[in-house]
Amino acid sequence: MAGQPEVQVSRLLNERGLSSFHVKLLIWSFFIVLIDGYDIGAIAFAAPSLIRAWNLKPGELGPVFSASLVGILFGSALFGWVGDRYGRKAALIGSNLLFGIFTFAAGYATNLHEMFWLRLLAGVGIGGVIPNVVAINAESAPRHLRATLAIIAVGFVPIGGAI
């Protein structure tokens, strides 16, 4: 618009420094990534019950463990693109919704085949979280804190797995 000064967002971010917005964003990131980390590790604790309930041999559950990791691979690429195209917030909402629906449904799986596909699809949602949490924290941070905030945000995954 004519007559109004041009605003450079990157300059404003760098001048402002760390704010309560960044702390709140990091707290939200903590909970989102913590839940994803928990889900990645939770199947290991459910395995003995599933083996007994479905009369499986221990090795038969291996593909279910791998399914979520394969889903994470595809989810990272898919939701990374969604975040670039439609925004990080939309990508985080979509990936968490996908993850939540299929993780909930996995609780009602009646056989190995169902569990495999539900864990694969939940993995797609989980995979979408990490690149977008890293990006949203880095993009909103002052230049000198970008790497630090991004690493802190993604560092919560193992904490979730340890719970």
PLM feature segments, named:
Residues 1-163:
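Transmembrane-helix signature of 12-pass secondary carriers
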